[in-house]
C-alpha cells in the first residue's frame, strides 16, 4: 500500500469510527488561511462560548464569611458588565510590563518641560515643597487604587469602582471626563513630538513628523495589548537611563566636575532666592506638580489585562515610591541647583529648548548631551501618546459595557482589542494635523480646558471609592483578612489625599482667576482655560441625573456588592502562600527584606 493510500485509509477510518462521530467536528481538518485573512478575522466578534458557572468562580471564597451563600450566586463583574458575546480583554500583560508601566509610564512633558515654568514661577524651594507634598498624595492614592485593583481587577478600574461604590452618575461624569482628557492629550503629544524634531531640524514641516508618529502609535495599539506593554517597557527603560544619568551628571556639575570646573553648590539658592513670587508662586507650583504626575493611575487600568494581578500588582504599586523619589524629587533637586529661576532660557524658549533638563546640561558646558536628552524627551512624549490611546480606549470600553455610553463602545474583538475606543482615539488623534495651522496653541488650550481637571477628579474618585469600600466592609461585618493586598497608608491615606486635592482645586480656582502678573485683576479667559473642566464635570453629573431620574447621591453601604468582581482564585491557598512567603522573608537579612518589599 502506498503512502498516499495509507493516509487516505487512516483518514477514512477516523471519519467512519464511532468515536469520530461524537468527539470530532467537521472543523478538525481545516484549510490553512493566510496571515492577512487571519488579521482580518481577528476583528470579528469572538466565538460564542457559554459563561462559566458562577459558583465555580466564587466557591473558593472563605466559608467563614457571613455572605458565603450570597457569594455562591454571584459571578465575575467583568462578565456581568460585558454585553453578551462582546468579547473580553486579553490578560497578556506580563509582570515586567506592569512594573515598567508603574515605574515610569506617566513621565512626560509635565516633568521634563513643564517643571521649567514651575521653577520660574515658584523658585527652587517651591519645586521641592510642591512635588514632595504632591508625591505623598499620589503615593497614598496609588496604594488605595492597588487595594481595589487586586480585589477587583476589572476593566475601567476607577470608573467601574465609582459605579460600584458611589453612584452611576458620578461614574458617568468622572469616566467620560477622563476619557476626553486622553482623547485631547494624544494630538497634543504628537505635536509635542514633532516639536522635539525641530530641535535638530526646523526646515521640515512638522506635519510630516506628526503623520509618522500618528501612524506609529495607532499601529502599536492595533496589534494588541502585548505590543503596547512591550513598547512601554522599552520606552520606560530609556526614561530610567536618562533620569539616572542626569542625576549622576547633576552631582558632577554641582560639585564642579564639569568642563568649566565651577563649583555651583547652592549658588542659585543664595543668588536668586529659594522662592519666587511669594506664596502665590508656591501655590501655582502645586498645580503644575499635580498635572506632571497625571497618568500615575494607569497601572490601575492595566490591571484588567495582567496575567496574574494578585502577584504582579502589589509589586508594581510599591514601585510608585521609587518613581516619586527618583524621577521627581531627586531630579528636580538638581534642576533647582543647576538652573536659575530667572534664567532667560526659561522665559523666551519654546518646546524642548525650554526644558530645564536641557538648560542645565547646556549651562554645564556640555554640548553633545542636550541632543541626547532631547531624544529622551521625544521618546517620553511618544510614550505618553501611546498611553493616551490605551487609557482612552479601555475607559471608553468600560463605560460602554456599564451602560454609561453607546453599546457599540463595549465591543471587544477576538484579539481582545476594544475597537470602539481605539477608533475614537484614532479619529481624535487627527487633530494633531492642526500643527499646520498658525494658531494651533489657542485651539489646543481650549480643547484641553474641557477635561483639564480630569486627573484631579479621577484621583479624588479613587480615594472616595476606597473610603466607601472600607466603610462597606465594616458595615457588612466583613474583615480585611479577605483582602490579599491592603493599602500601606490605610483608609486615612485616602482621606488625606481627598483633602489635599480639594485644596489644590481651591488653589487652582484662585490662580486661574487671578494669575501671576495680573496685579489683582480677574482674567476671565485664563480662568475658563484652567477651570472649565469643573463646569463640564458638573454638567455631565447633573445631566446624567436628569436623564436617569436617579436622585440618590450614592449607593447605601449595606447595598454595596462586595463579592461580584472578585477574581476566580482560591483565597485560602493565596493566604497560605502569603504566610509562607512572610515566614521565609523573616529568615532573610534586613536589607533583603527591604529590597523584596520596595523593589
UniProtKB/Swiss-Prot annotation:
Ranges annotated as biased composition (Low complexity) = 51-65
Give membrane topology per the record. Multi-pass membrane protein
Where would you find the membrane-spanning parts of this chain?
100-120, 122-142, 146-166, 180-200, 204-224, 235-255, 320-340, 364-384, 418-438, 443-463, 487-507, 527-547
- Cysteines joined through disulfide linkages: none
Keywords from UniProt, A to Z, are: Amino-acid transport, Cell membrane, Membrane, Transmembrane, Transmembrane helix, Transport
Supply the PROSITE patterns for this chain.
Answer: AMINO_ACID_PERMEASE_1
GO terms of biological process kind: amino acid transmembrane transport
Q: What induces it?
A: Expression is under control of the CSY1 amino-acid sensor. Expression is also regulated by PLC1 and GCN4. Expression is induced during development of biofilm.
Give a GO molecular function annotation for the protein.
amino acid transmembrane transporter activity
In terms of one coarse class, where is the protein primarily found?
membrane
**Region annotation Disordered: residue ranges?**
1-80
Instruction: State the Gene3D superfamilies in the record.
Output: Amino acid/polyamine transporter I (1.20.1740.10)
Which InterPro entries does its entry note?
AA-permease/SLC12A_dom, Amino_acid_permease_CS, Amino_acid_permease_fungi, APC_YAT
Compositionally biased spans, kind Polar residues: 12-25
What the protein does comes down to: Amino-acid permease that is able to transport phenylalanine.
NCBIfam families listed in its UniProt record: 2A0310 (TIGR00913)
Its recorded name reads Amino-acid permease GAP3
